[in-house]
Design a protein with these regions (language model features):
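Long, low-complexity, intrinsically disordered polar/charged segments
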Residues: 1-3, 112-113
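Exposed, interaction-prone regions of secreted/extracellular proteins
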Residues: 24-271
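Secretory targeting and sorting signals
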Residues: 2-23
């Protein structure tokens, strides 16, 4: 796998999130960011785990489902994780990402679960869509010219959020299904990948993307799929990392659109 690039969900810690539903506490660094892939000098990433697909034609939509994982909060140290589908953000020089998903964060020993969307580089929006561990979540991001439609549904409760938005320069160069270690950014734009929540395993299903005239799953031979592994101890990445754990995706299932990402504790240093 080639080196991977970086943007993300940016949550301002100093402002109350719009229409927040049990919003997860935010880090004191100033911004909690999700989005483009942080690249490293290895085959892995310091912030993304999952799959991305690319094609010479622009993508029009991406869809996926996952079961909201339960956060294990072992002590008072804050940890963060995000699960989402999106368009853009994968290319090395990506300038934007359109994404929606859920968070599983720990703060003060307690777990918090939140739904959100983001059209990076605009800040993210927290949603009044209650999410609990074990809930099945369905997400779709679709783009036509400068119109972005976000659709996020808690399939378990039947609650649905949908919104049509304007975005001047959407990135349609890739489609992704990702578990992420968010980044904390100060107000000068310096960012660090934050400690990754122990989420156990998150199962993605119904993963599809569309380009003009074609809809397919991750393993569709029409496009090129890349497996992305998150390694919290990589050297030579584009930004510092405090992820402190790995997140490793399994193989895509026989249906072509399902896979699992598993949190892994870092092995102790040797020597």
């Amino acid at each position: 796998m080639r080196r991977l690039a970086a943007i993300g969900l940016c949550i301002a810690a100093v402002a109350a999130p719009a229409t927040a539903a049990r919003a997860a506490p935010q880090p004191g660094l100033g911004l909690l960011q999700h989005g483009t892939l942080v690249r490293s000098d290895t085959e892995a990433s310091t912030n993304w785990a999952g799959y991305a697909v690319v094609h010479k034609k622009p993508f029009a939509s991406v869809t996926g489902r996952w079961v909201q994982p339960s956060a294990t909060c072992s002590d008072s140290s804050p940890t963060y994780s995000a699960f989402w589908v999106g368009l853009g953000g994968f290319a090395r020089r990506s300038f934007a990402v359109e994404q929606t998903g859920t968070l599983a964060n720990c703060e003060g020993g307690s777990a918090y679960y939140t739904a959100w969307y983001e059209l990076y580089p605009a800040p993210p929006v927290m949603l009044n869509l209650p999410i609990r561990p074990g809930d099945t979540v369905s997400a779709t991001v679709s783009v036509k010219k400068q119109t972005v439609v976000i659709r996020l549904k808690n399939v378990t409760t039947g609650k649905l959020f949908t919104k049509k938005l304007h975005m001047k320069r959407p990135d349609l160069g890739s489609a992704e299904w990702v578990a992420e270690a968010p980044s904390g950014c100060d107000f000068t734009g310096n960012c660090t990948t934050l400690p990754l929540t122990n989420f156990g395993t998150v199962d993605f299903t119904h993963s599809t993307a569309t380009i003009k005239g074609h809809k397919g799953r991750i393993s569709d031979p029409v496009w090129t799929a890349t497996t992305i592994e998150l390694h919290g101890d990589l050297a030579g990445s584009d930004q510092p990392s405090q992820a402190g754990a790995n997140a490793i995706p399994g193989a895509v299932g026989a249906d072509g659109g399902s896979f699992a990402v598993t949190w892994q504790q870092l092995a102790p240093p040797t020597g």
